[in-house]
């Protein structure tokens, strides 16, 4: 989640001279709403968030660097359909993030040449929501979280 983007960004920066060059990192909304769960994953994505900001400064003006921090988009392999639905229904917009939404955000970053060093929370408002089940707690939710954070 961090090493490969760092290496690719560094090598890409050596290859470009001028033009409309972009690096768009896929981060995670968890960098905006930290929890103690998924520790190593969240830590690596927080590192990618910081790398996005510092790379934008380092690579300018040749390369613009931005990020997208999606919320619930696709059910992970260890997650039940019911759990995934519960997760996205707990967001303020009560909908999962559509892959087309992410593609549109990539297009937005490419077309808007005055944007660099920004990370867009594309998460149906999940990073704003302080009353999600993982924050509210409860024995059932804690068991589910611990199962997925192994």
Predicted segment positions?
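A glycine/serine/threonine-rich, flexible loop-to-helix segment
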Residues: 67-91, 130-149
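Glycine-rich "substrate-gating" loop/helix at the edge of Rossmann-like oxidoreductase active sites
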Residues: 38, 92-95
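Catalytic loop of short-chain dehydrogenase/reductase
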Residues: 3-7, 17-47, 52-60, 72, ...
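C-terminal substrate-recognition "lid" of short-chain dehydrogenase/reductases
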Residues: 98-122, 127-128, 133-134
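Short glycine/proline-enriched coil/turn segments at helix->beta-strand junctions
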Residues: 14-19, 60-62, 82-83, 111-113
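Conserved mid-core alpha-helix of short-chain dehydrogenase/reductase
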Residues: 3-11, 53, 96, 101-104
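Acidic active-site catalytic centers that drive phospho-/nucleotidyl reactions
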Residues: 1, 45, 66, 101, ...
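Conserved Rossmann-fold SDR core element
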Residues: 49, 59-73, 115-122
